[in-house]
Amino acid sequence: MIKEIKSLAAAASTLALVSGALLMSSAAYAAEGAGNIEKGKAIAFGRTQGNCVTCHTMDDGESPGNLGPPLIAMKARYPDKAKLRAQIWDPTVANPESAMVPFGKYKVLTEEEIDYLVDYIWSL
């Protein structure tokens, strides 16, 4: 009986440790995600990098363009985040007549910058 109690206590301790570690890693992941979104926003509004606001209407955008579609409800438009990334990387794959710059194909942005940009745009 005492052996069973010790086993149960050990299992409960292990479960508590694992649960605590998961909660801490979830909080760290959320903080990292928020940081990535902020980095992506800086790229989207940066006049020397992504400069999305030149062609797209976006929240917080000053003097937004209207050449491209407004960047709203992006999770509804792109439920698959990978497809949004592919569109930013090379929009001419989906539409050869696209006026949008192929940011990845032409190496306008690095892969990491594209990831940040996708995180931001997908959050809109």
Predicted regions: what is each one?
Residues M1-A34:
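N-terminal export/targeting leaders of redox proteins
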Residues A27-R47:
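Electrostatic cytochrome c docking/interface patches
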Residues I37, F45, V53-W89, K105:
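Gly/Gly-Pro-rich "capping" loops immediately C-terminal to redox-active cysteine motifs
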Residues Q87, V93, K105-L124:
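C-terminal capping alpha-helices of c-type cytochrome domains
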